[in-house]
Design a protein with these regions (language model features):
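Short, Asp-centered acidic motifs that coordinate Mg2+ and/or phosphate
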Residues: 61-65, 151-152
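Structured loop/turn residues at beta-strand edges in well-structured enzyme cores
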Residues: 59, 107, 148
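A conserved helix-loop-strand patch within extracytoplasmic ligand-binding domains
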Residues: 68-71, 75-129
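Short, well-structured alpha-helical segments in soluble
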Residues: 46-59
Length: 297
């Protein structure tokens, strides 16, 4: 997925700036290397970004392409998110060889996911399910499903579509059941803060509406002290009039307690709206839920 994303941005830059020479450099992150443990147990923020950010700070590369959902809410000094792209699909995809939707699964069915967010929301609607950890790239995860290790798996719809696996999607989980991760479906292009040439080069990739939505979503996550591996879901969108709406939840890992609410307002107040919604959910029980998994908010 990471190589596809980098190649996509490289090709877009070459098309927009035909005279530019764009070189791809593959770097492996901690999150890529450790595949035999659940992401939540590896711990720490920046599992999929730290090595790339160090390479930029060292001057080895000029920019890095990330899934926005994998980015910590705090960017290291000297770096900046120079562009956030149009969101492809924010949804979570239900993938199965035999079943069309979560409600069709038999009692006790095995569902694969590496996400505490997905685990919690699945168990909220189907507490009988057996949720199993699933790591590896998209091809590896699909192969494990096809080998019969799981009755179903849940993956980001955008990733499946980008890699040409849209036909494997049996259904998209509705947001009433499954709120996505922060920034899910969008790409973030990170670069050095003072590199005016690179910032100008990637400006055409910026999506104004998605950038505003991401400000609200990331402000929410920042306030709840969350990395990308906590049971928190949030989705924001901006309408044609510049008004933003945001829906968010904090859940217990077993899915039996969910604090959920929404908020609306002017897009110019995106960060304040996201932060205020986080405060509301923390006060409504989210703080106690997060404390149980070692997070003080």
């Amino acid at each position: 997925m990471a190589l596809w994303q980098a190649s996509y941005v490289a090709e877009a830059i070459k098309k927009e700036h035909p005279s530019y020479c764009v070189e791809l450099r593959e770097l492996t992150t901690k999150g890529d290397r450790i595949l035999d443990a659940p992401l939540a147990k590896i711990g720490g923020k920046g599992l999929f970004t730290k090595e790339l950010e160090q390479a930029m700070l060292d001057g080895a590369v000029d920019l890095a392409v990330h899934s926005l959902k994998d980015m910590p809410t705090e960017v290291p000094d000297g770096l900046v998110i120079g562009a956030i792209t149009t969101r492809l699909d924010p949804g979570d995809a239900f993938v199965s060889a035999h079943y069309d939707a979560v409600e069709d699964l038999p009692i006790g069915a095995r569902v694969g996911t590496s996400s505490l967010r997905r685990r919690a929301q699945l168990l909220a609607v189907r507490p009988d399910l057996t949720i199993c950890d699933l790591r590896g790239n998209v091809n590896t995860r699909l192969a494990k499903l096809d080998a019969g290790e799981f009755d179903a798996i849940v993956l980001a719809a955008a990733g499946l579509k980008r890699l040409g696996f849209e036909r494997r999607i049996r259904s998209i989980l509705p947001r009433s059941v499954m709120l996505p991760a922060v920034g899910q479906g969008a790409l973030a292009i990170e670069c050095r803060a003072g590199d005016a040439a690179i910032l100008s080069t990637i400006a055409f990739l910026r999506d104004a509406g998605m950038t505003t939505a991401a400000q609200a979503e990331r402000a929410f996550l920042r306030r709840v002290e969350g990395g990308c591996q906590i049971p928190v879901g949030v989705y924001a969108e901006v309408d044609a009039d510049g008004q933003i709406s945001i829906d968010a939840m904090i859940a217990s890992v077993d899915g039996q307690r969910i604090c959920r609410s929404d908020a609306h307002g002017a897009g110019e107040q995106a960060e304040a709206i996201g932060t205020a919604l986080a405060e509301e959910l923390l006060d409504a029980g989210g703080r106690e839920i997060l404390k149980e998994i070692g997070i003080t908010a």
